[in-house]
């Protein structure tokens, strides 16, 4: 029986075109062996599963076995025909069971790895030098995200922090992805010599055109040029933001055509502050004046369409700018021929429907040298700035009973201000990061805490420490689309020449800002 079945199988194979006599004979022999093995297994199982045939009935069991065997052979025939390629190294039977991860498993694994990185906080919480807090508004899902990452790039004197305000149908997903990947891409670029050296000469030559207002301009006047560390880190910021936007464009499961996010990212390295800004989130500095009174200094500019240089770029690329009748104070960006999407900012991650019409993802990067009078930096989304002035924010943070409670106190104050000033409006999402600029004594204490926590994590991997190894703390699956040697900033620099900040208002005085909503 088995030989006859195997013979029919080999005869069927002979009618099919195949290449090579020797290879053909080997395939036929292999097919016979598999057929014999399958038939033997069926015969072993059949008596237990099939009742014995009646006397003289003539083989009900045998018919079942033959039918089963022929079905198996037909299946094997289809498999061999489809798999008779040079790369096939094992029978198809061994590959019928899927072995890959379940859908979404890679994303969950990557998220778990990020949560397990010591020194990284991406939810409500606090550490020795910072506190962060977010609260959902009344507009639906919370689209704000935030992060504090101590000992960034395995440097004890480096901290990365940022806030991200998503918008659009998938804004919450975009904000979280930027929160998770932007610091990784920045750290990957900082770890290369290319990231520290590329285009520093062009940055110096274009500094007057692309520099941001505030302390960076004053430092440039005093020193004659920007600090060397700024020229190097500015390049890394530009490259990281560029790659982050490219990652969003190529993402398979997050539709960013009508969704995006703002970003304010601060890198503190020793006494140096590097600030990268996209959109209308904001960073301010709490510092002391000559009379030792606490004052607010705005470190970023709200990049909105009503800024002359931003409006000029958008209109040059056929984008339209106008405000809705019910919100005459809020300028919005629209497509050339459609009254959509009405974006209330001039720069953002995502929003690829507008990327051909003036919206860009190139950040404004500024620099500040920390002095002994500087006390803290506050990063917040526009849910805070729409109802609180810079001076009010600095005052609220200053009166917090502890560093750990400062961010929460500010968010709760913003929610109370929303209810008082706009009782009929929906409260916007709020996210705040308060970064405290330690004195030398506090820095020494923080370093001691870091050493203690590092020793603790060696005993228990479940505890957090302030030391990370970026090269080993995150798997290669998480770090996607990192810049290669062939990438450059030619396109970014070309845009930078069109975008000047000579027309931007210098809001570094800490004055109350006009209240607008998205």
Swiss-Prot record:
Cofactor note as given: Binds 2 magnesium or manganese ions per subunit.
Domain spans labelled PPM-type phosphatase: 129-437
SUPFAM superfamilies recorded: PP2C-like
Chain sites annotated for binding Mn(2+) 1: 165-166
UniProt keyword Hydrolase, yes or no: yes
Composition bias type Low complexity, residue spans: 1-10, 86-105
Superkingdom of source: Eukaryota
GO BP, sorted A to Z: regulation of intracellular signal transduction
InterPro entries the record matches: PP2C, PPM-type-like_dom_sf, PPM-type_phosphatase-like_dom
Positions of region (Disordered): 1-31, 86-108, 192-222
Organism this protein belongs to: Oryza sativa subsp. japonica
Family: Belongs to the PP2C family.
EC nos: 3.1.3.16
Names of the cofactor(s): Mg(2+); Mn(2+)
Catalysis: reaction(s): O-phospho-L-seryl-[protein] + H2O = L-seryl-[protein] + phosphate; O-phospho-L-threonyl-[protein] + H2O = L-threonyl-[protein] + phosphate
Keyword tags: Hydrolase, Magnesium, Manganese, Metal-binding, Protein phosphatase
Residues given in the record as Mn(2+) 2 binding sites: 165, 382, 428
Protein name: Probable protein phosphatase 2C 14
PANTHER family: PROTEIN PHOSPHATASE
Polar residues bias (residue ranges): 197-213
GO molecular-function term, one example from the UniProt record: protein serine/threonine phosphatase activity
């Amino acid at each position: 029986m088995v030989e006859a079945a195997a013979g029919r199988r080999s005869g069927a194979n002979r009618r099919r075109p195949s290449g090579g006599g020797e290879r053909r004979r080997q395939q036929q022999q292999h097919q016979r062996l598999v057929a014999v093995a399958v038939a033997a297994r069926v015969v072993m199982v059949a008596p237990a599963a099939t009742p014995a045939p009646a006397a003289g009935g003539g083989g009900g069991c045998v018919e079942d076995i033959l039918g089963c065997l022929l079905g198996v052979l037909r299946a094997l025939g289809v498999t061999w025909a489809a798999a008779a390629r040079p790369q096939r190294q094992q029978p198809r039977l061994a590959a019928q069971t899927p072995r890959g991860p379940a859908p979404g498993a890679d994303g969950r694994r990557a998220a778990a790895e990020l949560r397990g990185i010591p020194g990284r906080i991406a939810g409500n919480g606090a550490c020795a030098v910072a506190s962060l807090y977010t609260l959902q508004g009344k507009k639906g899902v919370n689209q704000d995200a935030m992060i504090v990452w101590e000992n960034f790039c395995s440097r004890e004197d480096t901290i990365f922090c940022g806030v991200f305000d998503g918008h659009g149908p998938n804004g919450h997903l975009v904000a979280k992805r930027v929160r998770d990947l932007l610091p990784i891409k920045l750290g990957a670029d900082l770890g290369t010599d290319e990231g520290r050296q590329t285009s520093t000469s062009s940055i110096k030559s274009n500094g007057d055109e692309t520099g941001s207002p505030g302390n960076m301009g004053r430092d440039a006047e005093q020193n004659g040029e920007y600090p060397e560390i700024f020229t190097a880190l500015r390049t890394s910021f530009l490259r990281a933001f560029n790659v982050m936007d490219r990652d969003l464009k190529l993402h398979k499961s997050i539709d960013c055509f009508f969704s995006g996010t703002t970003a304010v990212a601060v890198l503190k390295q020793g006494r140096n502050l590097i600030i990268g800004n996209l959109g209308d989130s904001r960073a301010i500095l709490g510092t002391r004046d000559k009379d030792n009174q606490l004052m607010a200094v705005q470190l970023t500019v709200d990049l909105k369409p009503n800024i002359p240089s931003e409006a000029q770029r958008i209109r040059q690329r056929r984008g339209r700018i106008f405000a809705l009748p019910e919100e005459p104070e809020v300028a919005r960006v629209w497509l050339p021929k459609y009254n959509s999407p009405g974006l209330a900012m001039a720069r953002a991650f995502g929003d690829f429907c507008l990327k051909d019409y003036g919206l860009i993802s190139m950040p404004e990067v500024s620099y500040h040298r920390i002095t002994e009078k500087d006390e803290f930096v506050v990063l917040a989304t526009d849910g805070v700035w729409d109802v609180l002035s810079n001076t009010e924010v600095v005052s609220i943070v200053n009166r917090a009973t502890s560093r750990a409670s400062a961010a929460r106190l500010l968010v709760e104050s913003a929610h109370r201000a929303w209810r008082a000033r706009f009782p009929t409006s929906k409260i916007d999402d709020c996210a705040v990061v308060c970064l405290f600029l330690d004195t030398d004594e506090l820095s020494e204490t923080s370093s001691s805490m870091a050493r203690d926590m590092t020793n603790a994590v060696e005993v228990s991997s479940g505890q957090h420490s302030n030391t990370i190894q970026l090269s080993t703390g995150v798997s290669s699956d998480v770090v996607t689309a990192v810049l290669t040697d062939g990438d450059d900033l030619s396109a970014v620099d070309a845009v930078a020449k069109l975008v000047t900040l000579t027309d931007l208002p210098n809001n570094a005085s800490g004055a109350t800002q006009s209240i607008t909503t998205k």
